[in-house]
Structure formats: structure tokens, C-alpha cells
Design a protein with these regions (language model features):
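Hydrophobic positions on the alpha1 helix immediately C-terminal to the Walker A/P-loop
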Residues: 34, 38
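Hydrophobic anchor at the beta1->P-loop junction of P-loop NTPases
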Residues: 23
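Accessory nucleic acid-recognition modules appended to NTPase machines
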Residues: 181-339
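Interdomain motor-coupling "hinge/lid" segment immediately C-terminal to the ATP-binding subdomain
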Residues: 118-120, 124-226
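Domain-level recognition of nuclease-like catalytic cores that cleave nucleotide substrates
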Residues: 377-399
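Short glycine-rich substrate-engagement loop in P-loop NTPases that contacts/grips substrate
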Residues: 54-85
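Pre-Walker A adenine-sensing motif
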Residues: 2-16
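Conserved lysine of the Walker
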Residues: 31
Length: 399
């Protein structure tokens, strides 16, 4: 099992602090395994088994605890007085009124709470209001390229590893089935169907599953493109599948809530304001795109852009698409008063491509760092302060 050091460090940072640790992310990205590793770490450091309580609410053995009153009574009964109690709750959003249990336990002394969820419902609306100031969200993703390399048993060069990474995807279990192409496909297809049926269709009570699947295919085929709800609706209608903009908006919202897609808003770099129209959507894992739409040899540029987005999301900060006049910067990352700007391109060895990619970055007048990430395996180059970096090195080594 790969120790996910960055995430383990975050859990350790917040250990014993009076906040609820909420680990969110797409199904099977490793949330349960992360908490299991952290639990083992606690035991190795001398915490008694009696001080640790863990419950997975997808386990049929725990079905009785889906009643929040039964759950609360059970937890209260198992608390050890005078010592810190570590509570690990997997997929707690399955418990009706779970927020009442969490809120009541939070009021107790010597209780450290860790929960996971595969749906944004866990932190939505009234629940988020109830827990405001009481929780910290730790966003978990499938393996980064660096983690993927660490977990590999094969000794392969970066480019070959990257090709496999975008073909098979980055879910931890993929590495256990040793890249068997048919097994990978079956696993990802099963995972995708579970997400769509359990986290989207059931929760949102969607009746036209075929239409939902059509919208998912459209979105997966258009990662990294500006998505306008009306354009999606018009495209579906032109294909003979009439659908309203309101329905499309509901579908997209549900898919984002299930963490299968991530939404990135646009930011006007000159006006310093968030734009209300247009967004880009990125998949939580490129392997899923291959089972949704079939493996395609093209569109490697948007696939690379998707990979870079996920890496930036792992590293933290608010991520936006930058608007500079009529031009666009792929990503603007805001960390407090500090910004980072990123352009992503498969290759800039063509002079015109180089000029086109550099122009939006050169139009930014501040002194914050600017990067041009490409698949060109060349030494790092500076273009008037803009760092051109081989993207696979950046993925492995950071900036």
C-alpha cells in the first residue's frame, strides 16, 4: 500500500485539533485506505485499540447504524473516558440526519472525528452551515503521476509511464490488476456505473438515464473546453435528444457533486473579478474518459491539460481559467495574495505556437510566477521570466 505522504501529513497536522476532518473525493480514490493507514499510525504510536472506533456505512454489517439515534448511542457507549477517542466514519452521508450525530459528538471532550464522503451532499447547504468553522476539508484524488510512478513495479521511462497513466487511469486498484487491459476496462466501467447510478441517478431522482449518459459523454469528450449549458442543450437537441437547459444544469451539478467532474470558473485577470458565464470541466480520472467514450488517440492536448489541473488541485489554492482580453490563460492559481499562472501545450517547438502560448502570459503585468508546461523534453528555458518546463518533470518534481 502506497503511503500518501501529503495527505497523511494533513491528517497529522489536524490530529487532536477541535475540528472535524472531512475527507472527500470520487469513489475508490483511496479515502478508506487513507484513514486505515492513519489508524495504523495511531496504533503504532501507542494509541490503544479501545480508543479507536471505525464504521463503514456501506458495509451491510453496519446497517443498523444508519439510524442516527442508534449510531449515536453506540458511539457514546464505546467512548473511553479520560483519553482521546478517534472516530472514523466512512461514507457517513448514508446515515439520515448524520449531521446531528457529528454535531453532538463534536461537543464532547476527548473526541477526534474523521469522516469520508463520495458526494458533495456531505458538505452542502444546511449541513455546511451547521458545521461552519468546525471542519476542515481534505480533498483526495486518485494517484498523482508521482504516486503512480512510486507504486509501479516496472522500471519504465517517464513518457512510457505517462502513456500508461492516461490509458489505464490512476485509481489505486488499477495497479493491483497489473494493467490487464480487459480487467482495467471492466473495473473502470463498473466504477463509472456505480457513480452514475448510486451518486447521481438515485440521489437526484433522475429518470432519463440514457439522456444523462449522453450528457456525460458530451462532457467527457469536451474536457478543457468552455462549457455553456445552453450549448450542451442545443447540441443534444440537434442530435435528436431534446433536453432543456435547466435539466442539463441539474445533470452537470449532480456530476460535480459526485466528484466525477470538477468545475473551473473563469477569472478576469485585468478586472480582478470572477466571471459568471462559462466554465471548464475536468474529469477526476482520464481512465474514466476512455470507458465513457472509448479510447481515442487524439485530443492529447486536453488530456494533458486535465492532468495538470488535477495536479494543481492536489497542490492547493483556488484554480481559475484566466481571461486576458480576448486571450486565455489555462490556469490561474490564487493562494492568498499570491498568484501562479500556467499555460499547457503539447509542444511549442513551432515558432508560431510558442508565440501564441506565451502572449497571454506576457500580457500579465504583475511579478508572480508564470509557467509554460509542455511535453517537449527540453532543458528548462526562461522567456522574459516565464519558465518553460518539461511537464513530466514538473509532475514528478514540482516547480
Amino acid at each position: 500500500m502506497i503511503e500518501r505522504k501529503e495527505y497523511m501529513a494533513l491528517l497529522e497536522k489536524w490530529r487532536d485539533k477541535k475540528v472535524i476532518k472531512v475527507v472527500t473525493g470520487i469513489r475508490r480514490c483511496g479515502k478508506s485506505s487513507l484513514l486505515r493507514m492513519f489508524r495504523e499510525k495511531l496504533l503504532e504510536e501507542g494509541v490503544s485499540e479501545s480508543q479507536v472506533l471505525e464504521l463503514n456505512f456501506e458495509d451491510l454489517d453496519n446497517e443498523q447504524y444508519l439510524d442516527y439515534k442508534v449510531l449515536y448511542a453506540y458511539v457514546k457507549k464505546h467512548l473511553v473516558k479520560g483519553k482521546m477517542n478517534y472516530l472514523f466514519f466512512d461514507e457517513i452521508q448514508m446515515v439520515d440526519n448524520f449531521q446531528k450525530v457529528i454535531d453532538s459528538l463534536f461537543l464532547l471532550d476527548d473526541v477526534d472525528i474523521y469522516v469520508t464522503g463520495s458526494n458533495a451532499y456531505l458538505l452542502s447547504g444546511e449541513i455546511a452551515t451547521l458545521l461552519t468553522g468546525r471542519y476542515v476539508e481534505i480533498k483526495l484524488f486518485p494517484f498523482s503521476f508521482k504516486e503512480y510512478l512510486t507504486a509501479q513495479s516496472d522500471d519504465m521511462n517517464l513518457e512510457r509511464a505517462y502513456r500508461r497513466y492516461i490509458e489505464d487511469g490512476s485509481f489505486p486498484y488499477i495497479l493491483q490488476i497489473n494493467h490487464d487491459r480487459e480487467m482495467v476496462r471492466e473495473y473502470l466501467l463498473g466504477l463509472y456505473n456505480t457513480i452514475v447510478l448510486k451518486d447521481v441517478v438515485s440521489r437526484r431522482k433522475i429518470t432519463d438515464v440514457m439522456m444523462l449518459q449522453s450528457v456525460v459523454r458530451f462532457l467527457a469528450d469536451n474536457i478543457g473546453n468552455i462549457s455553456v449549458i445552453k450549448r450542451i442543450s442545443d447540441t443534444m437537441t440537434s442530435l435528436g435528444r431534446k433536453i432543456t437547459s435547466h435539466t442539463v444544469e441539474n445533470y452537470v451539478s449532480a456530476l460535480i457533486d459526485s466528484y466525477i467532474f470538477y468545475s473551473v470558473s473563469r477569472f478576469d485577470t485585468k478586472g480582478k473579478q470572477l466571471l459568471k458565464t462559462g466554465q471548464k470541466l475536468y474529469l477526476a480520472d482520464i481512465g474514466l474518459r476512455n470507458v465513457i467514450n472509448g479510447t481515442k488517440g487524439g485530443d492529447l492536448g486536453h488530456i494533458l491539460e486535465n492532468v495538470v489541473y488535477l495536479e494543481l488541485a492536489r497542490r492547493g489554492g483556488e484554480i481559475y481559467v484566466g481571461k486576458v482580453g480576448d486571450a486565455e490563460i489555462d490556469f490561474v492559481v490564487i493562494k492568498g495574495e499570491y498568484k501562479e499562472y500556467y499555460q499547457v501545450s503539447l509542444s511549442v517547438r513551432d515558432e508560431n505556437t510558442m508565440k501564441r502560448e506565451l502572449a497571454p502570459l506576457q500580457a500579465i503585468q504583475d511579478h508572480d510566477p508564470k509557467y509554460l508546461l509542455t511535453m517537449d523534453n527540453d532543458p528548462e528555458v526562461l522567456h522574459d521570466g516565464i519558465r518553460q518546463i518539461y511537464v513530466l518533470d514538473w509532475l514528478v518534481e514540482g516547480d
